[in-house]
C-alpha cells in the first residue's frame, strides 16, 4: 500500500479568514473595486500625513538646535566674562615678578652678548636687517680696530717684559739662596771633620758663664761646654750663643740646631759632636731633644690662669705639609679655646699671635729691602763676600728700568744713614728680614715657583737631617701666616732653651738665605683654634670642576678652583671646672693634632650665626660673580651651573640625603594622623566634660595626649584612670592603666574604643549624663526621666509584714503604728527600674556620640 502526503500551496494573495471564538471560519468578504480604490487613496493620504509629520519634526529639531547653540554661546560669553573678572582680581605682584624675571633673563642675555661678541655691528636689537655701511665708514672702523689691537699688543708686550724682568729677578734671587745653602753645607761639613779630634778636650776644659761671640774662623764665645761655631763646630752645652762664622745665627742650647740667619741647618752633634761633650757638664734635661723636636712656647688657659708648655713635635706629611703636635695638653677641652702660641727669636724677643697685637707690616719696596739687608750684611763678620744688590737683578738695557733703579738707589742712600744708626738693633734687623723673606716668597708664589724650588730645598735639608740625624733639629717652622700674609718664612723658632750666659748674637739678613720648609704654615689670628695647619699649595689643590663651600665647627672654607679662602670664628666656650678636673688625669703623651681636633659640641650664639651667614652670603655673591666672568657662555646656556655647589660639614658628592628624606616623610605622616585624631578629640571636648592635655613626646614625629574627666563630673571615690593617646607617624596607641590597650591606624575605631572606656566607667559608677553639664544631652530625655520618677512615687508601696504579735494593724490610716524594725521597704524593684532606665539613657547618649564621630 502506497503512503502519500499531499501539500496544498495557497495562492499569492489568500483571502483573509475570520473565525469566531469556537474556531468556525466566517465566509470571506469580497471587496469591490470601488472600495479597493478608496482603500488605496486612504493609504496614500496616510502616507503623506506621515511624511508631513516627519518634516515638521525636523524643522522643530533644527529650531531647537539653533536655540541650544545660542544658549551655549551666551553661556560661553558669561564664562569668559567671569574668567576676565577673575584674572583682574589676581594679585598684580605675580605678573610683576614674572615680568621682572623675564627682564632679568633678557638682561643676562644682553650682558652675555656684549661680553662675548664685543662687536656692535653683530648685535642687532631692533631688527633682523642692518643697513650696510659706507665704504669710508668701513675703512675708518677697520683702521680703528687695527690701532686698538696694536695698542693692546703693545700693552701685552710691556706686561710680558715686566713679568720677564720680575721672573729673572726671582730666579736670580733663588739661585743666590741656593748658592748660600750649598756653601753653608760644604763649610759645616768640612769644619765638623776638622774639629772632631779637638772636641773632647775643649768640652772638658770649658766651664763658667757664657762668653762673647767669636770672630770669623776663630773660637767663639765659650759658655758652659759651649764654643762659638766660627772655626770649631757646634757644642751642645749650657747655651752660650756664639758667633756663627760671621753669619750670626748662634747655637740653640740643648737642641743642637744652629740658626743661620733664621734657617735651622742643624748643629754637628752626632758622631762629630758627641765627643765634644765629655764631662764638661750638660745641664739636666737637655739631652731629651731629638730630630723632630721643635722649640716652641705655647700655652692654654685653665681655671683663669695661663699654663705654659715648651715642647712640640714636628713631622712632615706625605704631600710636604708640616704637622705640629702639642703633646702636653692635659685635656681636650683646652683646644676649644684659643691656643696661644708665642714665637721667640734667639734674643728672647717674643712675638705673640694675639689678634689685638698683630700689626700690618709697612710696605717697603723690594730694592730698598735688598739694599738694607746688604748693608746689614756688610756690618756682620761674614767670611764670604756679601752679595751686592745688583746681583739679584738681571742685566737689561731698558732706560725706564735704569731710571727707576737710580731713583731707588738715591732714596736708599738717604735712608742708609738712618739705618746705620739702628743697624745693631736686633729687633729692627729681624723685622727687615721677615719683610724681605715675605716679599721673596710672595714673588715666588705669584709665578708658582714656590713648589718646584722649595721642594728641592726640602729634599736637600732632609738629606742633611738624615746624615746628621742624631740629636739635631730638623729646621724651623716654614712660616707664620698672619692675616693672610706669610711672615717670617724660614725663621728659626728655637730660642734659648739651655741655661747659661749668652754670648754675642749676630744676625744675617741677606735675602739669599733660603727657606728649607715651605709648605706648612701656621694660620694665626683669624682662626677659632688659634693655630690651624693648612696646606697652601695651588698646584696640589687645583680643582676647577666645581666650587665647594664647607662649614666646619670652627671655620668656613671656600674652594673655587685655585682660589682657597678660610674664614675662622673665635668661639667663646664656657669652661666647666668639673670636666677640667676629670680630664686632667688623661694621658699627657697623646699627640693632639690641631688640624682635626675641633669640638663637636660648639653652641654658636645668634650673633655668631648671623655673622657666619652674612659672610657666607657675601662669599656666594663673589663666587657667582667669578663664575659669571669665567664662563659666560656656560652659565647662559646651562642654568643649573649658575649657583655653586654648597657642601656643609664634609666634602662629598651626594645628591640626596636619605636621612633628611626619611625625617621629612615621617613628620608629614605624623601631621596627617595628628589632624585626623585631633578632630575626634575636639568632638570629645565639645560633648563631654573632659580635660585634654598635650605633653611633649620623645621623638620629633610623635605626639602624646592625656584625657581625663573633670573632678566635678566623676565619682571621687573611684576616679577614672587617665587615658593616654600616643601618635607615632601613622600609628595610634591608646592606653588606660595596665590592662586596657589599643593600637590601630583608624581614628574612627580609636573614637569608638575611647567611648567604650568612658561608657563603662559611667555605667559602673552609676553616673547619669543628666548629672553632667553636657551639651549633647537631650532635655526631653530628662523630662521623661522625671515623669518615670513621679509614676514610681505615686505607686502604692508594698510592704512585708512579720507575724510578730507586737505589731498592730489598724484600718484607720491616721492611727497606723508600724514597727520599723520589722517592716522593710521593698525597693529592689524600684531601683532596678531606675537603673535600667538610666543605662538606657547612657547607651543612647554614647550611641549618638559614636554616630557623630562616624559622620565627622
Swiss-Prot record:
Q: Which residues does UniProt call coiled coil?
A: 41-91
Lineage, top-rank taxon, reads Eukaryota
Keywords recorded for this protein, A-Z: Activator, Coiled coil, Membrane, Nucleus, Transcription, Transcription regulation, Transmembrane, Transmembrane helix
List localization entries.
Membrane; Nucleus
Q: Which GO terms describe its cellular component?
A: core mediator complex; mediator complex; membrane
Specify where it is mainly localized.
membrane
Protein name per its UniProtKB record: Putative mediator of RNA polymerase II transcription subunit 17
